[in-house]
Amino acid sequence: MSWFADLAGRAEDLLNRVDQGAATALRKESTSNTFYSKNTDYPELHQQNTDSTYHTGQKANYISSAADNIRHQKATIIAGTANVKVGSRTGGDASHPTEHASVPRPSSHFVRRKKSEPDDELLFDFLNSSQKEPTGRVEIKKEKGKAPVLPSSQSSAVSSVTTSVTTIKATEENSGSQSPEVSSSDSMPEGHKKSTEESTVSNAISVEHSSVPSDGSMSHELSNLRLENQLLRNEVQSLNQEMASLLQRSKETQEELNEARVRVEKWNVDNSKSDRITRELRAQVDDLTEAVAAKDSQLAVLKVRLQEADQVLSSRTEALEALQSEKSRIMQDHNEGSSLQNQALQTLQERHEADATLKREQESYKQMQSEFATRLNKMEVERQNLAEAVTLAERKYSEERKKVDDLQQQVKLHRSSLESAKQELVDYKQKATRILQSKEKLINSLKEGSSFEGLDSSTASSMELEELRHERELQKEEIQKLMGQIHQLRSELQDMEAQQVSEAESAREQLQDLQDQIAKQRASKQELETELDRMKQEFHYVEEDLHRTKNTLQSRIKDREEEIQKLRNQLTNKTLSNSSQSELESRLHQLTETLIQKQTLLESLSTEKNSLVFQLERLEQQLHSAATGPSSGSSINMSGVDSGEGTRLRNVPVLFNDTETNLAGMYGKVRKAASSIDQFSIRLGIFLRRYPIARVFVIIYMALLHLWVMIVLLTYSPEMHHDQPYGK
């Protein structure tokens, strides 16, 4: 209940603030004249208070009603002590406090607690006094008839009494409206309420009568009324607290009851489910017991039938075992004969294959020797050609050197002639200048001479001048011609020098290239010679290995032929005893093991041979690349390798044997077609392996084909026919 106490404390603080505000407002309004209603008749006021309706509102209405009540109470106190005349209000103003007083408070927290005063004995005496309500009413009526207008003190006392009564009734009715269920069962009886109301009314009347004689008695009665009001408030508060606790308990019990009901309902549902499940299980158990009983009867019948069938089966199995033993004995004899024949055939085939492989290896070795001889001859021819080319280049270089020397000599001669021409030109210029100077001197002397000479002298001088001018023009033309020749010789000399420099550089480059080619040819020749030596050694090793394998295979073939002969003798002389059969079986097992071992040896030898063949092919490719590298014109003629039988350089597994292709019918044709396809694919692979250019072309062709297919797939859009279906 901590929140309840906190709420009560907050309400008390709020009431204290409201009291302070009301006191300040009353002090400001003490100068103004306020009038109360003329209805001083207490029974009418009491009836109006008892018959007024109570309205519920928000907390602001409760606070305003409490503030109005406190304001009215303090107004009566101030009017009684200071003898302030208070007028009657208007009808709307008189009814306003009653309406606000009639509004019930939500709880007793708005009732302000006050300290108990010392005159408790007087309060109890006053409460135990025997004054009655009707006499008070009569006296009030008489006094009303005597004096129509009461003094301000009497009206204020009556208004204070009415407000106190209304506040008490409002608090009681509020508590009753908050807990209607509890008040109906646990609240005070109505007689007690009426007695409290009558006592309050009688107290109000006594206060009214006592307020007429003097102010001291009125203050005493007011204090008594305050005490009584405080006691009533305390009682109402205690009752409210009890009612709240009872309400809380009732709510808790109601919640517990609801929870218990929910639990009971859950238990009932669970019990009903469990009952239903048990019924279903019982029904299933009954059905299963009936089915088990039916199946037991069926099992008994089936057991009898099974016993009969077992007897029939046992008899039949005995007969079958006898037949199978005979069949196995016959099949064993047949298998032994066929296995011996197969072994003989296999040994013969292996012998033929070994001979064929030996022949092929010998032929391939011979071909390789011939190819190497041809390659060596070609290399020697190429070396001779290169030597001749080097000698020719040296000759060309010497000739070019000679030409360069001749050109240099010509240049020197041209330079000397040019210098001599320049010297002659300078000398001629000097001579011409001297002649001109002498002529000018003559002309000047002639001019200075007497002008009285005859016409002959003047004509002679004029003729000489014309001749000199003509000579001068001729000299100028010759000088221009010589200058043109000099320029031409200079340009020719520059061209010759540039040509000489370019020819010298080209000759140097050619010499450097030739020297590089000679060095490369020498290095490649050394490498090829080393490779040839190594390959010769490898061929020797291969020949030795082949001879060894041939000898071992021949010895094995002889051993197998001896074993076959022994087995044939044993087959002709075999007996039907168990001991001879066991010996034959052990012998067959030994033969099969030896065959398996020999097959593994043959496979290992074939793998070694294949590896050697691969090494040879790699060396051939290196030789081919070395031969085609320095001289693009040189090539190896391998036309004789692909032609003829036995030209395969490695032991590629054939799909079918050549001995089995001679069979007639569809089976033989299929074998022939498969073997021909196999041979073609092997030759194609060898061709692509030997010629890398063909491989490059095939790769480019496949890439272009795939690219074209992708372009077609991505760019092709099918034709969309927008015709309607059903031929419309």
From Swiss-Prot:
Q: Which residues form a coiled coil?
A: 216-628
Task: Spell out where the chain crosses the membrane.
Answer: 696-716
In this chain, composition skew of type Basic and acidic residues spans 134-146
Q: List the disulfide bonds.
A: none
Q: Which GO terms describe its molecular function?
A: protein homodimerization activity; protein-macromolecule adaptor activity; small GTPase binding
What cellular-component terms does GO give this entry?
A: cis-Golgi network; COPI-coated vesicle membrane; Golgi apparatus; Golgi cis cisterna; Golgi cisterna; Golgi medial cisterna; Golgi membrane; Golgi trans cisterna
Where, in residue ranges, is this chain on the Cytoplasmic side? 2-695
- The biased composition feature labelled Polar residues covers 173-187
> Which residues get modified to Dimethylated arginine?
R27, R89
The protein's location, in the record's own words, is: Golgi apparatus membrane
The protein's topology relative to the membrane is: Single-pass type IV membrane protein
A GO BP term here is: Golgi vesicle transport
As stated in the Swiss-Prot or TrEMBL entry, residues carrying the post-translational modification N-acetylserine are S2
Enumerate composition-biased segments (Low complexity): 152-167
Q: What is this protein's function per UniProt?
A: Involved in maintaining Golgi structure. Stimulates the formation of Golgi stacks and ribbons. Involved in intra-Golgi retrograde transport.
* Record note on quaternary structure: Homodimer. Interacts with RAB1A that has been activated by GTP-binding. Interacts with isoform CASP of CUX1.
Descriptive protein name: Golgin subfamily A member 5
Organism whose genome encodes this protein: Rattus norvegicus (Rat)
Give me the gene this protein comes from: Golga5
